[in-house]
Amino acid sequence: MPRKVPVSGDMTAIGEVRTAPFARVPDPERLFERRARRFHQLSGPDGIGPYLGFLAGIAEAQQALTGQLPETDATDEARLGLALDHAMPPLDRNAFKPDAEFRSLTDRLFGALQEVAKPPAAQNALSAVRKADDASLDAMVADLMADSVPVGAMAEFAYVAAALQLHFARAASRLPERRLQPVGDGACPACGGPPVSSLIVGWPHASGSRFCSCALCGTLWHHVRIKCAICSSTKGIRYQEIEDGPGTIKAETCDECGCYVKIFNQQKDSSLDPFADDVGSLGLDLLMRETSFRRGAFNPFLLGY
């Protein structure tokens, strides 16, 4: 069973400054480079190590394409203003419809992924998704945006998710981060997506502050500690971790909504990555299955957990 960690003191006030920046939009090349490097560090011959090595290859392909794709269009000021006026995400994922630009991106990414070492089942899934017609691709995108993926097609959906991450990270990078604002509980201020995990950062002037990380576009947004990352409740918040673990990876549980979201402490380990380490800490998810809490975060490479 996970080890429960008691909460003590006023942890909502932790941080070097009282007002941390609300949001940080991603630098796509650095985002995927860091993710790939961390996946490589976590990979190995045993357990899920080979799978993590495969995911490193996906992140490397995503990074490589960031410098090869045409530059994304600048943010439409009228559309941005309308979204901000109504507390809506400027890159509303629920309104996204695959267009010719996205289909070109998927073709190039899937082509690059042909060169990534992978087991036969993963290769078969890639071949299948490359043959998918426009209607099938549109349906897969819609399911991913709804966080609803058929169990029997998880591998195919993971490839489409990788393309969506690349598309949305590039789009989010063009947003004016200082103008972003909260859009709802457990929602990214850039695209409206759910968090993949949260971080206690060690940044200058914000050290000790907590940020949620978007599973889709990679935007980070400030979220005070001892507060549920899904429903924003401050009641019944507890922490659980693997016994005798490093103390840097914990599951934050909420009695109000019954969810848990992982929290990584970069102050103690700067190599932690909100996306890669979410997959790398699968053991914590397996232990949390023995509790009454369900996973509240979304990770397309952990579908089924």
Please identify what each model-predicted range represents.
Residues 1-79, 256, 260, 264-305:
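Charged, low-complexity interaction segments
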Residues 130-132, 154-162, 195-202, 289-291, ...:
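Short N-terminal helix-initiation segments at or just after the protein's N-terminus
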